[in-house]
Curated annotation (Swiss-Prot):
InterPro entries linked to this entry: KH_dom-like_a/b, RbfA, RbfA_dom_sf
Organism: Pseudoalteromonas translucida (strain TAC 125)
Acidic residues: compositionally biased ranges: 126-143
Subcellular localization(s) per the UniProt record: Cytoplasm
Protein name: Ribosome-binding factor A
GO annotation, cellular component aspect: cytosol
Annotated family: Belongs to the RbfA family.
Keywords noted in UniProt: Cytoplasm, Ribosome biogenesis
Role played: One of several proteins that assist in the late maturation steps of the functional core of the 30S ribosomal subunit. Associates with free 30S ribosomal subunits (but not with 30S subunits that are part of 70S ribosomes or polysomes). Required for efficient processing of 16S rRNA. May interact with the 5'-terminal helix region of 16S rRNA.
Record keyword Plastid present: no
GO molecular function, one term: ribosomal small subunit binding
Principal subcellular localisation of the protein: cytoplasm
Length: 166
């Protein structure tokens, strides 16, 4: 079996050429920083879904507006694409917003915040444990002090400190 099917090769070529067209040919102020993230082509090469991502915007409406602008300019983009790609059939183009990048960033931020909260919780737990072990050491030291009995080393062997024989 071949490594890549014809539809995959056509999709890659369309992705590359549309990215260049968007960068150099389309001058609409309503478009943000649009990039082509993926292209899916039907088996008969008559339809192509172009997934776009819009950078520098957190607003979902701005991304949808960019997709609408590109869908309005589909005829022009398709004619430019036809000049760049030699194909018997030029697919009908449909621009769709790709939310996977934004979802990935949102999930990554959630994971990062959970890790920060967990680390802060562990730091707080460790300081509580250190405080309790310091308190236990204080109790142990006070017990050692009460058990300590002074022995008079100056007295003679075999006699207690009160002078009685052992």
């Amino acid at each position: 079996m071949r490594e890549f099917s014809r539809t995959d090769r056509v999709a890659q070529q369309i992705q590359k050429e549309i990215a260049v067209i968007l960068q150099r040919e389309i001058k609409d102020p309503r478009l943000g920083m649009v990039t082509v993230s993926a292209v899916e082509v039907s088996r008969d090469l008559s339809y192509a879904k172009i997934f776009i991502t819009v950078f520098n915007t957190q607003d979902d409406n701005a991304a949808k507006q960019s997709a609408n602008v590109l869908n309005e300019a589909t005829g022009y983009i398709r004619s430019l694409l036809g000049k760049r790609i030699r194909a018997r059939i030029m697919p009908e183009l449909k621009f769709l917003v790709d939310n996977s990048l934004m979802e990935g960033m949102r999930i990554s931020n959630l994971v990062d915040s959970i890790i920060r909260e967990d680390n802060a919780k562990h730091v707080a737990d460790e300081t509580d444990v250190e405080d309790s072990t310091d308190h236990e050491d204080d109790v142990t030291n006070s017990e050692d002090e009460t058990k300590h009995v002074d022995i008079d080393t100056d007295s003679e062997e075999g006699t207690n400190t009160d002078g009685k024989a052992q």
